[in-house]
Amino acid sequence: MYFATFICTYAIFFVPLQSQTKSNNMRKTLILMLCAALVACSAKQQKMEDECLYSPSKTQFAFWSNAAEAMEVLIYDDAVTDQHLPLSLAKDSDNYWRATLHGDMIGKYYTVRSFQNGEWAPEAPGIFAKAVSVNGQRAAIIDLKATNPDGWDKDQRPAMPDRTDIVVYETHLRDFTMSPYSGVTNKGKFIGLTEEAPLNYLKELGITHLQLLPFFDYGSIDETTLDQNKYNWGYDPVNYNAPDGGYSTDPYDPACRIREAKQMIQALHKAGIRVIMDVVYNHTYDVMGCALGRVVPKYFYRLNADGTYANGSGCGNETASDHEMYRKFMVESVCYWAREYHIDGFRFDLMGIHDQETMRQIRAALDEIDPTILTYGEGWAAMAPAYPYEELAMKQWTYKMPRVGAFSDDIRNALIGSPFDHERGFASGNPAGAKDVMRGLIACPEWSGEPMQHVSYITCHDNYCLRDRIEVSAPEETEATKLRMNKLAQTAVLVSQGMTFIYGGEELYRTKQGIDNSYQSPDSINIIPWENREKYADLHDYYQAMIAIRRAHKGFRLGSAEAVKEHVEFVLTGNESLVIYRIKDLEGIDTAKSLMVILNGSAQTVTCDLPEMTGECVLLAADGQANPDGLDFAPYDKIDVAPYSATIIAEN
């Protein structure tokens, strides 16, 4: 580009304006070189995101395909009629097919189709459609600026001093709002999360980030029959870059879902809460039912040796992040959501299907927008991906992807047992996982380079919720004991040095009636039981207090592997049901000189000697109770730790 600019400058200012043939030919040659260079640079810099650029005077189209023999965009007056205007596209040297439609096209709809192997493929919205009709069948031409709510230009991400300060709360829009006890008027809608009741609840709980299950346009819910209240988690991508109409108040208006999604994010930001989007780039709802499969057949997917679609997702296909243009698509897509919607983080579903280089490029691109935007995901796949294992973004290679996190199924399995059997975990009486609990507490196992890459959790939308998990592994225990196990397991997460993650509703003792895969179960199974706020107030208040304790003490959030190594030690007693975790020498780091956490995973009271705690101490948690201001103040040289409970002491 700089060379082209030099040529331009030279041609205009330094080639003499003479009539001699030699000078004129030189000028023409230089100008032609400039034009060629500028065209090449323009093609290289073309964004897939800019497939439809609207202005009141014209709309420009640019679609990528390396296989089409011809392409055309079909212009419709509305979302339903068949009559359309076909517009032929011209191919450039970088496989972008372009056309310009003059005049004000706002309110029109479009699809694109490609001709190859002697036939026209089915039409589809563009690969990067940003606004779509009901059920995402056609893309809409809109003015994105007109979808911005009042004050959108002043919207700011809430401050986040350090990534280990994060407490993520995962929920689904319907889970959080559909209950008659939720206090929400616009149930199941983006704008339901702009209302006072849910915002106040989240603020009071003390979480920093709200992770929402997929809310891009997905295919498993018919948006024309929303009155039937059908439910789905949403891991069925159709149009990656438009919100789903099922969460809008008018799915027939392409701008409505965009505006209301922005209103939701704006309201959460005003409440001091960041928003994480659950993204599913690893597969599509089906292949020929979406633009990726129709516009450029097979290119965006990995194939088996026999030409069939690989299936690392377990959903019938897996995408090919290692292919240059799908990698480009993924990078541009997350950046689009970060810029246009002010999204604060991305949770990558089945991240292990993607290659490591793509995740590194996503991280680098987001850093250019805002380095505090989060990236983490599931470091595994459902089945074996069709790509070299050592190059995939699997959990064990997390350290190769700086500042990309992965869920720690290690600490989950150690604390509550594996989701693939009904065995107990440490928090429910099985000491076998004690060493993995310790590794999880320091958030520096062999696979994570830094604590922030270790997502400490015990439950999420997948598998059993915590109440049901404890029920299937310890059915003979009383409810009082099960509640103690619940608190103990979550305490270990909240004092871990990693990034903490809570599944929404666990603090209200939610149950899914024993269903461990509620992806399409009805609201009655999935909703958060707000009516439990009174019945299980003790559990809710414990979660709230533990979040406050974590946020009050930097010792639980040291932030680097080096600091963890310097300040953390374990006291070994020979009792495998006891984990004693001490964070020492905290002067200048924490208000406490040291912190002591004792986790008792047995059914017996255990007396612990505390020779290290020589100063006056504050008892922050004990026997299923917690208070960031202290339950008791006294010097402690020994303490009794109740069954299935955590004791936390701060030494002043």
Label the predicted regions:
Residues 29-37:
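Sec-dependent N-terminal signal peptides
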Residues 172-196, 200-341, 351-354, 358-370, ...:
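Substrate-binding/active-site clefts of carbohydrate-active enzymes
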Residues 41-43:
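N-terminal Sec signal peptide cleavage junction
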Residues 63, 112, 171, 212, ...:
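Conserved, mostly hydrophobic/aromatic
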Residues 45-58, 92-170, 175-186:
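The feature marks proteins involved in alpha-glucan
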Residues 135, 139-142, 363-364, 368-509, ...:
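Conserved alpha/beta catalytic core and glycan-binding cleft of carbohydrate-active enzymes
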Residues 57-62, 67-69, 569-611:
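Carbohydrate-binding surface patches
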Residues 107-110, 631-652:
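C-terminal beta-strand-rich structural cap/linker in extracellular carbohydrate-active enzymes
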